[in-house]
């Protein structure tokens, strides 16, 4: 900023501003000036553009006009939300000195820094989505990754081994803000992400990280958290924790532990799989018609966030899954009673985080009280449920009768938004506060008692006590009796027919009244802060209760979904395989206007791969995706859309379904397809579920067919993964004859003339044809084009009906081999239209073709 160069020439106020701004050069500084937050110089210009507010000038300093923009303090949350959504960070600078006693500018300091990943204010957060701060670290052995949800205290770290796994973690967690080291090598991995923050190398130092974490948790080492031997993850976690403390300017008592996320604990899904399965976000970037949109009927925001975490991280521990299944089954008869009560609990998790940060507002405490008031009824309802896991949840949620009583006594029924507005603490909670309020409201009998006493003492029957806005309190005596006024009466005002006096006692009362509002508000703020001190010792138990309530909400929701949508409880088996009877796509069946056609599926060690053929639009992709979604739902403990399901161990789910050009990275559709295919072939195991849809479409027919054939062979013979392999290459239907564990299935269709009816029914065996021309006609391709295509199809089929099959059946074609050169005579003939030639032109063509042979 050029203004800093001539520092001494500025006014004292601008010098104060420039000193504070120098401490936060890269972010906007909201500088409190009375009822406004003001921004100056470059900050003002930037804020004017980002917030669409007026850019003005605030006088001059150092001989130069000062660009300025301002926002009212009472509307600051709306403007902060706009800035945070654009990835900006803001330092909030408040007046902490008393203007009445300050010599020079009022003392100010930055009290907090609002960044996209560290927000906890209700107005700035999306209530049904996690808001994560993340840090990434890399060395020669791999990556370290840590995430923190400051609005709940959830702190996680992991050590992705390679670039693909790291990309999948970024896709899964989708952090609002990402910290990275200044020498981070894999910039292409994070470029374009929101909220990127470059940090100095020393913030990732391992010894500093251990020290920071031990200090935060009050421990001597990190062995108890299971992260002691995760140096890369700890480097990321240390940087993240330091950043959180720096921005919040307070201790973080709600961050009490850190958890290691290990690959073997959950089913791994790469970024492409999460995108293709449309778990919480559809391919267009919205939330409609996703798996979450069908499954998420939770009644609390914290329950919704927990369900989404489950969906993105299916667990492999069958003990956990069986417990969830048992709980869902036990709760099915109680959903109608439980959900209305759970709805009243609200977002206790985030309220507790604001309590820990000491930023909780009066209405947060009122909502906390309301949540506590639901616990007795919830506990009574759950007591009748015959389920050990349910009873364990009941115990974890606690009762908190003392805290409920405290908040019922302390906070009025409908408090104002801010404590500075006053009127938050209930009457009767504090005697001194009640006295100050009574003085402020004039709701005391002191003046009446004073008047009676003074009349009796003086014997003056015209004496009365009163008040006016100009002179304050007074004792009035009629002019006829004024000569009898006692000696301690000091004249305050003379009227035509009366004299007004003041006495020391009344003056003292007047001073009390005049300062009572300020003193009442100051005491109220003090009592409000003391409430934090009374609540915070119970923070650990309260967080445990919030977690139990969120889990109960998820399980009650899944019980309701299972009953309403006719889902069944899947059975887990020991051997690899998936057997589905009458399976349905959970999302598609909800958006169809006609009944969904349910289909079976059988994958086992003896039947590891299904080659799926059938018409385009026939339902191949739907059938494949529904299998993956049923597996995913089973591995979060949910019931599934089928008549019966048996499912074995799954370590990863891969999808190679559809593709588009990756223009940002300069990769074609085919390159994207091959990159995803390579990832599958390198990382799939016999316990993986693999969906391969139309491999080889983006290149020449023989290249594509050869690749598809080789990929299928590798998956079936070497990897032995459970594979659904959809293809338009009918030559691949020969694979079951040549390899064990491969079978053909197809989706049926009926063709009548130029029309086609899709049956969407999966049958054993290969499809008889692709129905491509019928689908083209259905799409509205002109009739003359369809007619010409049919003619060309007959020609090709008559020339070499089995050429491609023969080619693949023999030695696999090399992508690097040089194809046979096409004869120039053949090329010339292909472009020749005989019907348009004159006799002379025809004769010339004969001689030309002769010369080409």
From Swiss-Prot:
Swiss-Prot/TrEMBL GO biological process terms: mismatch repair
Protein origin, superkingdom: Bacteria
Cross-referenced Gene3D superfamilies: 1.10.1420.10, 6.10.140.430, DNA repair protein MutS, domain I (3.40.1170.10), MutS, connector domain (3.30.420.110), P-loop containing nucleotide triphosphate hydrolases (3.40.50.300)
Residues given in the record as ATP binding sites: 614-621
Keyword field: ATP-binding, DNA damage, DNA repair, DNA-binding, Nucleotide-binding
GO molecular function, one term: damaged DNA binding
Protein name: DNA mismatch repair protein MutS
Organism: Escherichia coli (strain 55989 / EAEC)
């Amino acid at each position: 900023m050029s203004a800093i160069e001539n520092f001494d020439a500025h006014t004292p106020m601008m010098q104060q501003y420039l000193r504070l701004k120098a401490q936060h050069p890269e972010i906007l500084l909201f500088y409190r000036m009375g009822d406004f937050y003001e921004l100056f110089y470059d900050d003002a210009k930037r804020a004017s553009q980002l917030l669409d507010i007026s850019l003005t000038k605030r006088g001059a300093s150092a001989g130069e006009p000062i660009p300025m923009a301002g926002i009212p303090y009472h509307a600051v949350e709306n403007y902060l939300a706009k800035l945070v959504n654009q990835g900006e960070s803001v330092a909030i600078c408040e007046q902490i000195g008393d203007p009445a006693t300050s010599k020079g500018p009022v003392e100010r300091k930055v009290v907090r820094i609002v960044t996209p990943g560290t927000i906890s204010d209700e107005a700035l957060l999306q209530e049904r989505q996690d808001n994560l701060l993340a840090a990434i670290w890399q060395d020669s052995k791999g990556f370290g990754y840590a995430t923190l949800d400051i609005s709940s205290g959830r702190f996680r770290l992991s050590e992705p081994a390679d670039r693909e796994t790291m990309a999948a973690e970024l896709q899964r967690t989708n952090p609002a803000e990402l910290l990275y080291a200044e020498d981070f090598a894999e910039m292409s991995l994070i470029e374009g992400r929101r909220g990127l923050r470059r940090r100095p190398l020393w913030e990732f130092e391992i010894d500093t990280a251990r020290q920071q974490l031990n200090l935060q948790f009050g421990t001597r080492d990190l062995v108890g958290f299971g992260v002691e031997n995760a140096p890369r993850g700890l480097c990321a976690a240390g940087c993240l924790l330091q950043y959180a403390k720096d921005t919040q300017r307070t201790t973080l008592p709600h961050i009490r532990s850190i958890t290691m996320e290990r690959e073997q604990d959950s089913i791994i899904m790469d970024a492409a799989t999460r995108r293709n399965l449309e778990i919480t976000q559809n391919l267009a970037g919205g939330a409609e018609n996703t798996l979450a949109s069908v499954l998420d009927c939770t009644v609390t925001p914290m329950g919704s966030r927990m369900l989404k975490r489950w969906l993105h991280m299916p667990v492999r521990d069958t003990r956990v899954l069986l417990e969830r299944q048992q709980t869902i089954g036990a709760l099915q008869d109680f959903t109608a009673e439980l959900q209305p009560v759970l709805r009243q609990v609200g977002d206790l998790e985030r309220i507790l985080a604001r309590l820990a940060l000491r930023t909780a507002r009066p209405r947060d405490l009122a909502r906390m009280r309301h949540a506590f008031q639901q616990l007795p009824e919830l506990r009574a309802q759950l007591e009748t449920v015959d389920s050990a896991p349910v009873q364990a949840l009941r115990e974890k949620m606690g009762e908190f009768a003392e805290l409920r009583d405290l908040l019922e006594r302390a906070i009025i029924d409908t408090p104002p938004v801010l404590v500075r507005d006053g009127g938050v603490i209930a009457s009767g909670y504090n005697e001194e506060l009640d006295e100050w309020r009574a003085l402020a409201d004039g709701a005391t009998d002191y003046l009446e008692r004073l008047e009676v006493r003074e009349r009796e003492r003086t014997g003056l029957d015209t004496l009365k006590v009163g008040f006016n806005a100009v002179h304050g309190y007074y004792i009035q005596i009629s002019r006829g009796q004024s000569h009898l006024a006692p000696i301690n009466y000091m004249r305050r005002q003379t009227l035509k027919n009366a004299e007004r006096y003041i006495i020391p006692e009344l003056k003292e009362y007047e001073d009390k009244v005049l300062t009572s509002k300020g003193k009442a508000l100051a005491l109220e703020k003090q009592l409000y802060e003391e409430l934090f001190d009374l609540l915070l010792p119970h923070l650990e138990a309260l967080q445990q209760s919030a977690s139990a309530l969120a889990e109960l909400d998820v399980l009650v929701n899944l019980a309701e979904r299972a009953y309403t949508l006719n889902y069944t409880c899947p059975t887990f088996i020991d051997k690899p395989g998936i057997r589905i009877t009458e399976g349905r796509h959970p999302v598609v069946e909800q958006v169809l206007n006609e009944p969904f056609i349910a289909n079976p599926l059988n994958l086992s060690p003896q039947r590891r791969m299904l080659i799926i053929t059938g018409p385009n639009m026939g339902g191949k992709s739907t059938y494949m995706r529904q299998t993956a979604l049923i597996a995913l739902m089973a591995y979060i403990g949910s019931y599934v859309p089928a008549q019966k399901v048996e499912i074995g161990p799954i370590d990863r789910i891969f999808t190679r379904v559809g593709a588009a050009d990756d223009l940002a990275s300069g990769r074609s559709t085919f390159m994207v397809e091959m990159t995803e295919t390579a990832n599958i072939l390198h990382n799939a195991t016999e316990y993986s579920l693999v969906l391969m849809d139309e491999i080889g479409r983006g290149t020449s027919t023989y290249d594509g067919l050869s690749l598809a054939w080789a990929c299928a062979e590798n998956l079936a013979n070497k990897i032995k993964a459970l594979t659904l392999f959809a293809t338009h290459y009918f030559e691949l239907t020969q694979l079951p004859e040549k390899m064990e564990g491969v079978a053909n299935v197809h989706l049926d269709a009926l063709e009548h003339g130029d029309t086609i009816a899709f049956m969407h029914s999966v049958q054993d065996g290969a499809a008889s044809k692709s129905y491509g021309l019928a689908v083209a006609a259905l799409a509205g391709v002109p009739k003359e084009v369809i007619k010409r295509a049919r003619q060309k199809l007959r020609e090709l089929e008559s020339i070499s009906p089995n050429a491609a099959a023969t080619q693949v059946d023999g030695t696999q074609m090399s992508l690097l081999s040089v194809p046979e050169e096409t004869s120039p005579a053949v090329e010339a003939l292909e472009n020749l239209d005989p019907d348009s030639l004159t006799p002379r032109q025809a004769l010339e063509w004969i001689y030309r073709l002769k010369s080409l042979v």
